[in-house]
């Protein structure tokens, strides 16, 4: 197996490569290209140009650049012979890009080759363990991604690297706020769960609150400041949802998942704790608990992309449908940005 990566940043080094090493007894050969020569993660052989990488007999190509550059790389990849192209979230970064992407994927041949990835779409343990019979059994769902954070010398909150826990040196700017950057994760997990329970693709969302890193409201016309926290509210397949996003939740942060409230009074809580997912079924004073070890990327790559029963193999038509759902989610989140900040 020969894998290719365009963009060799932190997500490749801290998420993809460890998951690949865990999955394969003998790791596959990996090739990569990045416009920054200093980026050379261990286990990846660099190509000097993107064209050189795309000319190789790749089994799967991963597009892991910054989101603003996903589309331009995807266009070149579709012009090559690579048959499986996986694009990191969000698949695009602006509304004009979504229009161009939709035109690009209007061809069934192109659409069948492209999988828009959000690794949280593999977090469907509620479905796998048959804890809910049908979407009609659900009263409401809370989705949440509350990232732990630290403090700088001035006592201001600072983001931490999701994999290492070290301070994130980047200065985050719009559109890299929580609505698009991590809202995609929660929305993908919620929609996939609801879909498998018999729900449809209908969804609505509005911004209840959006604040910057220091807790100040995002002002109309502000096209620079990234949201540090946000509360979104709406519905998915008619089920009321609240989504809570916070990149600066302090030392008590770390909650990552969903909470489902059932009509019979039971509550399902799916969270991330340490190196494992934890699923709980709460019925009054009774609590059942299941633990799912391994990283989310390990499960997603194994179940959807690299395994013998990958989505490309078991249900080729679902590849384009999955991508369509991820595009719908990104489009909605980008539209929320327009409403929050004004047209841009």
Regions found by a protein language model. Give the residues of each.
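A contiguous active-site-proximal alpha/beta segment in oxidoreductase catalytic domains
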Residues: 60, 91-159
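Beta-loop-alpha module in the N-terminal Rossmann-like domain of NAD(P)-dependent dehydrogenases
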Residues: 45-86, 90-104, 123
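A structural signal for well-ordered alpha-helical segments within the folded catalytic domains
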Residues: 14, 71, 125, 177-191, ...
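A short helix->loop->beta-strand "cap" motif at the edges of active sites that frequently abuts
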Residues: 27, 80-84, 109-112
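NAD(P)-dinucleotide binding in Rossmann-like oxidoreductases
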Residues: 220-229, 233-304
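N-terminal Rossmann-like dinucleotide-binding module
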Residues: 1-42
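Rossmann-like dinucleotide-binding domain that binds NAD(P)(H)
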Residues: 164-240, 244-252, 331
């Amino acid at each position: 197996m020969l894998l290719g990566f365009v963009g060799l940043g932190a997500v490749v080094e801290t998420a993809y490569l460890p998951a690949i090493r865990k999955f394969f007894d003998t790791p596959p050969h990996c090739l990569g290209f990045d416009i920054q020569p200093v980026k050379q993660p261990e286990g990846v052989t660099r190509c000097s140009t993107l064209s050189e990488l795309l000319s190789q007999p790749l089994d799967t190509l991963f597009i892991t650049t910054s989101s603003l550059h996903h589309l331009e790389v995807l266009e070149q990849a579709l012009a090559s012979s690579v048959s499986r192209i996986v694009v990191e979230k969000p698949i695009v970064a602006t509304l004009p890009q979504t229009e161009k992407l939709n035109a690009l994927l209007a061809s069934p041949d192109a659409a069948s080759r492209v999988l828009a990835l959000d690794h949280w779409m593999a977090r469907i343990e509620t479905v796998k363990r048959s804890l809910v019979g049908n979407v009609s059994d659900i009263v409401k769902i809370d989705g949440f991604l509350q990232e732990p954070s630290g403090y700088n010398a001035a006592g201001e909150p600072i983001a931490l690297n999701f994999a290492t826990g070290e301070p994130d040196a980047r200065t985050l700017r719009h559109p890299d706020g929580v609505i698009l950057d991590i809202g995609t994760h929660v929305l993908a997990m919620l929609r996939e769960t609801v879909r498998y329970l018999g729900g449809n693709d209908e969804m609505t969302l509005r911004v209840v609150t959006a604040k910057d890193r220091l807790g100040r409201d995002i002002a109309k016309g502000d096209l620079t400041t990234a949201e540090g926290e946000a509360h979104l509210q709406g519905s998915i397949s008619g089920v009321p949802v609240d989504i809570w996003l916070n990149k600066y939740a302090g030392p008590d942060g770390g909650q990552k998942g969903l909470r489902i409230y059932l009509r019979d009074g039971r509550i399902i809580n799916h969270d991330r704790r340490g190196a494992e997912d934890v699923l709980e079924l709460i019925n009054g004073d009774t609590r059942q608990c299941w633990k799912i070890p391994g990283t989310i990327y390990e499960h997603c790559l194994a179940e959807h992309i690299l395994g013998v029963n990958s989505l490309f193999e078991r249900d080729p038509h679902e590849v384009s449908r999955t991508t369509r759902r991820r595009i719908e989610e990104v489009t909605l989140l980008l539209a929320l940005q327009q409403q929050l900040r004004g047209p841009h």
